[in-house]
Amino acid sequence: MKDIDIGKEYIIPSPGYRSVRERTSTSGTHRDREDSKFRRTRPLECQDALETAARAEGLSLDASMHSQLRILDEEHPKGKYHHGLSALKPIRTTSKHQHPVDNAGLFSCMTFSWLSSLARVAHKKGELSMEDVWSLSKHESSDVNCRRLERLWQEELNEVGPDAASLRRVVWIFCRTRLILSIVCLMITQLAGFSGPAFMVKHLLEYTQATESNLQYSLLLVLGLLLTEIVRSWSLALTWALNYRTGVRLRGAILTMAFKKILKLKNIKEKSLGELINICSNDGQRMFEAAAVGSLLAGGPVVAILGMIYNVIILGPTGFLGSAVFILFYPAMMFASRLTAYFRRKCVAATDERVQKMNEVLTYIKFIKMYAWVKAFSQSVQKIREEERRILEKAGYFQSITVGVAPIVVVIASVVTFSVHMTLGFDLTAAQAFTVVTVFNSMTFALKVTPFSVKSLSEASVAVDRFKSLFLMEEVHMIKNKPASPHIKIEMKNATLAWDSSHSSIQNSPKLTPKMKKDKRASRGKKEKVRQLQRTEHQAVLAEQKGHLLLDSDERPSPEEEEGKHIHLGHLRLQRTLHSIDLEIQEGKLVGICGSVGSGKTSLISAILGQMTLLEGSIAISGTFAYVAQQAWILNATLRDNILFGKEYDEERYNSVLNSCCLRPDLAILPSSDLTEIGERGANLSGGQRQRISLARALYSDRSIYILDDPLSALDAHVGNHIFNSAIRKHLKSKTVLFVTHQLQYLVDCDEVIFMKEGCITERGTHEELMNLNGDYATIFNNLLLGETPPVEINSKKETSGSQKKSQDKGPKTGSVKKEKAVKPEEGQLVQLEEKGQGSVPWSVYGVYIQAAGGPLAFLVIMALFMLNVGSTAFSTWWLSYWIKQGSGNTTVTRGNETSVSDSMKDNPHMQYYASIYALSMAVMLILKAIRGVVFVKGTLRASSRLHDELFRRILRSPMKFFDTTPTGRILNRFSKDMDEVDVRLPFQAEMFIQNVILVFFCVGMIAGVFPWFLVAVGPLVILFSVLHIVSRVLIRELKRLDNITQSPFLSHITSSIQGLATIHAYNKGQEFLHRYQELLDDNQAPFFLFTCAMRWLAVRLDLISIALITTTGLMIVLMHGQIPPAYAGLAISYAVQLTGLFQFTVRLASETEARFTSVERINHYIKTLSLEAPARIKNKAPSPDWPQEGEVTFENAEMRYRENLPLVLKKVSFTIKPKEKIGIVGRTGSGKSSLGMALFRLVELSGGCIKIDGVRISDIGLADLRSKLSIIPQEPVLFSGTVRSNLDPFNQYTEDQIWDALERTHMKECIAQLPLKLESEVMENGDNFSVGERQLLCIARALLRHCKILILDEATAAMDTETDLLIQETIREAFADCTMLTIAHRLHTVLGSDRIMVLAQGQVVEFDTPSVLLSNDSSRFYAMFAAAENKVAVKG
């Protein structure tokens, strides 16, 4: 097996799919065919995109699966258009496809009749479930379409290279054939829509002016009008049918391609999690809309040209004027649409930032509550929201202009044309005037769809840029080199590695230069420039590997140079982290890796996993990986699925793994044993349980190389010891194991120990050899003294099964607990299913929205403005008909001595009067339009902002149990997708809907005014309409709801996959995660596609009603020949023609607007149903400002359970902690240690008893008053995106000197001082640009600053090496000498110095005394734990 040489020639991969090019010394020779499955082909010989993707994942391809997947339209034996052409048969009798859309003939496609069966089911049942909905057609499946799009993108990259590659061009090629066809259908629509008014209506009106009646001729005209309208309606439906399928294919393809790319990324640091979620939710939607609506733009110019030619023929040169108005308005509307899109683009950036911030808040909500920082975070989100609102308002004004212009343009064009026409002395008849008005009306179609089209295309253009930047990000390197000797598993020769430009981990000691990050406040424009610079910088790095871009600590330029030249490029620098690493790891060896915080331990592991950039030397690997990350990654799935991780269930191996990882006692108390569902990020597990499940996953995977990154730090001492012996030493005996740890006692048993310092391996050998060497390792080991004291509990089995009664987290997202005994399996479900609304959107939801917009009065004002607006438009058309009627035979003129009756309008002596009022109506209309636009935008924005603020307030004030049972993806969905609907789409649709409803009523009213008998015909049509509406309403609403609830799972899948990227890479599970994603996406696409089709299904049927109305009007004109003035006949027919498209559009808007209101309903559901914590502050009950002065803590019969119906986790706990006392709290996982903290912070309210601090009952005071006086250093360090300063002091309460002092005492001053912007340096999302140890030190600095009287330490030094640990313990002792301190410990040596030790078991205090008393009693539990530990140190030390 030959491999890619990653030696001196190793390069940073070029962006895109060609990220690891073959570089061989024998460049001309071609590799053997059978070797190809482990490498990527040369770009020019690129085969199927799936193979390329599979190779990137390092997967072999099963031939049968491969051939099965290659059945694409292109490879169909009858040609790639076979499926499409078979749809041209008018009616198809065979039903060989599973989805009815694939069996539909042309007639069924045009009328969407294939959907009728689902409409019947929906009507019958009153609701729809996923079982009722057809799964997606194979032609729309994301898998098939993604491979096609991927192939086209690959070809584009090969032809022009990544920089010049155009994703727009690729998307166009992907959709080209179908879009061209849809444009052809659109042309037919436009021609039919134009010829109806231009020819049929004109002849009908001329017939009304004629004196003789000719019934046969006139009925033929009505029939002609009927046929042109049917052709117009059905060809338009066919356009939509084509566009929707194209859109669904494009959305599925590009979203799958995006996720595929995310799975292959080294890291996602260039993009925030919020941005990736937005790309995969909103941007996918934008692509669909562009494909669905974008092509309608082509219809505009055609109608404009036809209309202009026709008007000139009818009116002469003045006909140009009206068309000129249209032509001028067209670019004006385009400009307004472009401006809307420009503001939308700015808005998207603000939304990204808000969603990212929300994601952070939700992830660390427990910590935010504990620190009483809710207000600070609330203000930061509100600040971003204010900026977003400002941009939304500007976008809203321009959007309102584009929405309201279409009906006005007809009036303006008519006024200008007819006024000038008459002023110039030309005559005007009713036939001429109303034919021109009717043609103008048909021309408004172009103006109506223009805002939609331009908006969708502009937004898609932004989305395409975001997708392209994602597709060009660098991929992970799967190291393919094999070591020379078969017995060596990992070989590194003189390897120098760096975190590349997009990675952020500092991962080096404070003495090394931490990576510079750009100042977050730099403008967005600068960010784009930097991204472009980044690509050129890549080449610069290659050319200059030892140059100034790769600075070591001793090569740093002066601060002045730094500032001038490098600050804006800070994040582009490759930060050398590992230097000249020489390492050979033999097969079957257990290798321990240790070193101080930031010495490069995690970097070494990342290098082996291919996540760093190799600058010099080589790396060779032989074997497959299992990886246990420092912070365990848990899926939202059952506990068993988390361990199996896609492998077959083997009972014997599975049971052996459970025993090795001490998981049996945990299973005994979980509601459904190993079938219990685990919440997102392991929300309902303790830190120790998460770590053990992660370890069990590694053991079960049966790989050859095991990489364990500090896996025992979160475990109780005796559990850790058992796992080290049974899992790592015994279970993995024949495997190669890299074991990173801070717990030095385990290194005694390792075959080899590697000691790291400042990114170098400084000592290496067995434990004995390193002790004899008397170097850094020996010094630290001797300093340990008693060392870690992990006991092997004497009666471990009996003890563990009895003592572990609950499991709950000490990490940032937790607070759940399990039952004491096995219960009904359904109780194993922690995460509740998402609620799905029933029936129609209740009126109360509309009421809530109206109330939020300003109440009933504001609503009435807005409605009155709409009425006046549409009324002024209708008035101007009526005035024209009145003017024509007055000029038709009512005027007497004198020629010479003769007086005669003239029917010419130009002879009317009051022409000036009529013309003035006609022109004035236009001015009034424009003023009303402007007022209405401003008032409407203000109202809807006030509504959405109030809903957002109230939702946000409710979420922040919800108790912890809500966050434990609700996936973050679901809550985020409210703030991203639902908020996007309420902010942007709902106002857009509601404005058009209200305007059109009023217009429909005016149309029917005008026609009925001319022909009262018309109302008789309207009756049956109203009944037909009601039936249609009842049926379609259920169908459309239910499909929209299904679309909403299938959206959350695939967003949650993206979130969780991104968080576990390193684990997915290590286990090579990319393909499985991709398949799961495709399933979830297709599950969402199925109801989404049917929802869009259901709209058109309704539209086609409504068109038949409006065609019936126009035919009725035509028949009335024919049958009442000579009884009504031609001017009024013209008025009636012009409104009837206007009604055709308008009617179905309005009803569709009604359904769509109701569907958009489901987002308001979902937001309102949270606002109404979420229970709230106690108030932050309670008037008249606030404690004194200097409370607590002493720090005495008293528990009196305290009882607590996490949620209703769950067992107690604290049972009648009573004790008193004296002021300034230092208490160590020990006990098995689930004994209730962290529950004490939860009770003290009131994250969970007590079920009985009380807690007092300095005699004040904490349940009587406000939460903020309580929590701001307590401090906690959590087990898992929490840093927020922002600056170092904002992380330490979000309220700006402390001086710079105080902050530097806190950093100095936590040994972080040097590290922060070396950052270019010092305290203002950027902290990335999750604190990813600091190592875990450094994050923990910053958390301790934060607690030092707060300096509260009561401090809880939740095993705060678990992620630190022993040396730093000892220093920090000393700092804490000194700094908090006058504080009451509770230390929740896993490692016994951390609590030996405590004044008293509390031993917990099963939620009760079983021992509470000084360490000396407990150790002198040989029957105490603490003694048993300590004796075992003492024994181990004595033997091993």
Swiss-Prot record:
The modification Phosphoserine is found at residues 14, 19, 60, 505, 509. The modification Phosphothreonine is found at residue 513. One of its GO terms (molecular function) is purine nucleotide transmembrane transporter activity. Residues 19-41, 795-827 have a biased composition (Basic and acidic residues). It holds the Pfam family ABC_tran. It is an enzyme of class 7 (translocase). Gene3D superfamilies: ABC transporter type 1, transmembrane domain (1.20.1560.10), P-loop containing nucleotide triphosphate hydrolases (3.40.50.300). The chain crosses the membrane at residues 179-199, 219-239, 296-316, 317-337, 400-420, 434-454, 608-628, 848-868, 917-937, 997-1017, 1018-1038, 1104-1124, 1127-1147. It is a multi-pass membrane protein. Residues 514-529 have a biased composition (Basic residues). GO terms for cellular component: apical plasma membrane; basolateral plasma membrane; endosome membrane; Golgi lumen; membrane; plasma membrane. It is found in: Basolateral cell membrane; Golgi apparatus lumen; Endosome membrane; Cytoplasmic granule. cGMP transport is highly sensitive to inhibitors of cGMP phosphodiesterase, such as zaprinast, trequinsin and sildenafil. One of its GO terms (biological process) is transmembrane transport. Residues 501-511 have a biased composition (Polar residues). Its main location: membrane. Residues 562-783, 1193-1427 form the ABC transporter domain. Signal peptide: none annotated. ATP 2 binds at residues 1227-1234. Its EC number is 7.6.2.-, 7.6.2.2. The keyword Nucleotide-binding applies. Ubiquitously expressed, but levels in brain and muscle are especially high. All isoforms are equally expressed in retina. ATP-dependent transporter of the ATP-binding cassette (ABC) family that actively extrudes physiological compounds, and xenobiotics from cells. Mediates ATP-dependent transport of endogenous metabolites such as cAMP and cGMP, folic acid and N-lactoyl-amino acids (in vitro). Also acts as a general glutamate conjugate and analog transporter that can limit the brain levels of endogenous metabolites, drugs, and toxins. Confers resistance to the antiviral agent PMEA. Belongs to the ABC transporter superfamily. ABCC family. Conjugate transporter (TC 3.A.1.208) subfamily. Although other labs have confirmed the ability of ABCC5 to transport cGMP in an ATP-dependent manner, they obtained a much lower affinity for this substrate. The authors conclude that ABCC5 is a low-affinity cyclic nucleotide transporter a major function in cGMP excretion is unlikely. This is ATP-binding cassette sub-family C member 5. It comes from Homo sapiens (Human).
